Curated annotation (Swiss-Prot):
GO biological process, one term: glutaminyl-tRNAGln biosynthesis via transamidation
Complex and partners: Subunit of the heterotrimeric GatCAB amidotransferase (AdT) complex, composed of A, B and C subunits.
Localization of this protein: Mitochondrion
Organism (species): Drosophila melanogaster (Fruit fly)
Keyword annotations: ATP-binding, Ligase, Mitochondrion, Nucleotide-binding, Protein biosynthesis
EC number annotated for this UniProt entry: 6.3.5.7
Family as reported in the entry's similarity comment: Belongs to the amidase family. GatA subfamily.
Residue ranges the record marks as coiled coil: none
Record-linked InterPro entries: Amidase, Amidase_dom, AS_sf, GatA
GO molecular function list: ATP binding; glutaminyl-tRNA synthase (glutamine-hydrolyzing) activity; serine hydrolase activity
Enzyme class: ligase
Gene coding for it: GatA
Name of the protein: Glutamyl-tRNA(Gln) amidotransferase subunit A, mitochondrial
GO CC annotation: glutamyl-tRNA(Gln) amidotransferase complex; mitochondrion
Length: 508
């Protein structure tokens, strides 16, 4: 066992400063472990030469006692839908299999400017359309908590950012970047027993993130602790002139209080009754209740609230998702860029065959459905109506967070992240992608619809020895309080993703 795997990012960089460890050694260990854990299929591409140079540069800065940030020399992985200069960015699809961007996504450039070591690109559902990381050109990603990684008893890692979650859970990197459109960071974080943060929409630049649903896409952060998530957020957040949707006001770095200094007496916690839904497992419900009791016993005000339009949220999300997908996928025509078919008898034939060969069935289905919903005869009935209901969903959150009646207002919402523990692949694959997303995204997509921040934190193990997590949501730009409460809960439950994971069931 590599002892530094149990350290936080702050402890790791302190060890660089005092000479206990070096960025090059940690990077070499990480690359070796990534190859040793190839069966997880967390990475689709490692970048050892680039990572080695970044680690060497960081090591030189520490020798000169001139580290440039809290992430200098820290190993990080990037989901394969973020553009990385001179490194393939494929969205796990044949359509972009040969695409090498000439520029970095803003998130990636800010990490590099901070001295982070980028290990490589992580697996995902094709074009981020999925909830299991099983619909990838490179094959499915496995969950390190699986009973057996080599037989039929392996568990999914969640999706669509399952590769990033799996890499962090296995100790292959200290943090990873994912994307979150309807829960694609929080869902795999829940299943893999790590922290997954979806920031406020517009807080982190989407420039260079290949779009799925422009109005909901948010870069997400994976780490093994809340404080590590904060370290990454402090690096990547803030206005970006290359993304007009970023919030213009300057970002104020977050500084979380020490656990012993956190006072919950003024914190109001809401329990949305609509999240007690069909399919919620008894163990998740018990976990939810116990954490609510823990918060109340520690001085927080806890009460039930109602978000009445939650029941419609998954349907509205599905409609809007498919409509925006149809629009975003139109650019992949085999002519301008992307996979190009060999049959060039006509422009129409080239266009049709390139898309037929370049997209999998999941992507094709969403494109077809989205175009159907956007037909003139359907536009008002589906798309326009979905937009109106989306506003009602956002107003539900605004009402509980901003209510003029003090007795009705709350600061934080506590809910499940996923309805169950990570399912077996064979059970997950028995349902269609559409049906799985309707189940897996139920608790997570409302935050994307409203644009508010949310974080998933692991709480305990199920009877089957698998992580169970809960989600916290708060008002827009209230990450400080959201992550403070998350840190307090984290300290009480003392969940350690590495201590219990498969990482220590095998010798490294």
């Amino acid at each position: 066992m590599r002892r530094h795997l149990q350290w936080s990012i702050k402890q790791l960089t302190a060890s660089y400063s005092d000479g206990q460890l070096s960025p090059r050694r940690v990077t070499e260990d990480a690359l070796q472990d990534a190859l040793r854990w190839k069966t997880l299929n967390a990475f689709v591409r490692l970048t050892p030469e680039q990572a080695g140079q970044q680690a060497q540069d960081a090591e030189q800065r520490y020798k000169l006692r001139q580290p440039i940030s809290d992430l200098d020399g820290v190993t990080i992985a990037i989901k394969d839908n973020f553009c990385t200069k001179d490194v393939h960015t494929t969205c796990a699809s044949r359509m972009l299999q040969d695409f090498v961007p000439p520029y970095d996504a803003t998130v990636c450039s800010r990490l590099k400017q901070a001295g982070a070591v980028i290990l490589g690109k992580t697996n995902m559902d094709q074009f981020a359309m999925g909830a299991g990381t099983v619909d990838s050109l490179y094959g499915p990603t496995k969950n390190i908590w699986s009973e057996d990684l080599n037989k039929d008893h392996w568990r999914i890692a969640g999706g669509s950012s399952g590769g990033s979650a799996s890499a962090v859970a296995a100790g292959l990197c200290y943090a990873a970047i994912g994307s979150d459109t309807g829960g694609s960071t929080r869902n795999p974080a829940s299943y893999c027993g790590v922290v997954g943060l979806k920031p406020t929409y517009g807080l982190v630049s989407r420039h260079g993130l290949i779009p799925l649903v422009n109005s909901m896409d948010v870069p997400g952060i994976f780490a093994r602790s809340v404080s590590d998530c904060v370290a990454v957020l402090n690096t990547v957040a803030g206005p970006d002139k290359l993304d007009s949707t970023t919030i213009r006001q300057p970002f104020t770095r977050l500084h979380l209080p020490e656990v012993g200094q956190i006072d919950l007496s003024t914190v109001r916690i809401g329990i949305p009754k609509e999240y007690h839904c069909h399919g919620l497992s008894a163990e998740v419900l018990e976990t939810w209740s116990k954490v609510a009791d823990l918060l109340e016993c520690s001085g927080a005000s806890v009460r039930q609230v109602s978000l009445p339009n939650t029941a419609a949220s998954i349907f509205v999300y599905t409609i809007l998702n498919q409509c925006e997908v149809a629009s975003n996928m139109a650019r992949y025509d085999g002519i301008e860029y992307g996979h190009r078919a060999t049959d060039e008898r006509s422009t129409e034939q080239l266009y049709a065959l390139s898309r037929a060969e370049g997209f999998n069935d999941v992507v094709k289905t969403r494109i077809l459905t989205g175009n159907f919903l956007l037909l003139k005869k359907n536009y008002d009935h589906y798309f326009e109506k979905a937009l109106r209901v989306r506003r009602l969903i956002a107003e539900d959150f605004a009402r509980v967070f901003d209510s003029s009646a003090k007795e009705e207002r709350v600061d934080i919402l506590l809910t499940p992240t996923t309805l169950t523990e990570a399912p077996l692949y064979k059970d997950f694959a028995s349902l269609t992608n559409r049906d799985q997303c309707a189940v897996q995204d139920f608790c997570t997509q409302p935050a994307n619809m409203a644009g508010i921040p949310a974080v998933s934190i692991p709480i305990r193990l199920s009877q089957a020895g698998l992580p169970l997590s809960l989600q916290l949501m708060s008002n827009s730009l209230n990450e400080q309080l959201l992550l403070t409460v998350a840190r307090w809960i984290e300290a009480q439950v003392e969940f350690d993703s590495l201590e219990h994971s498969q990482q220590y069931k095998a010798s490294l």
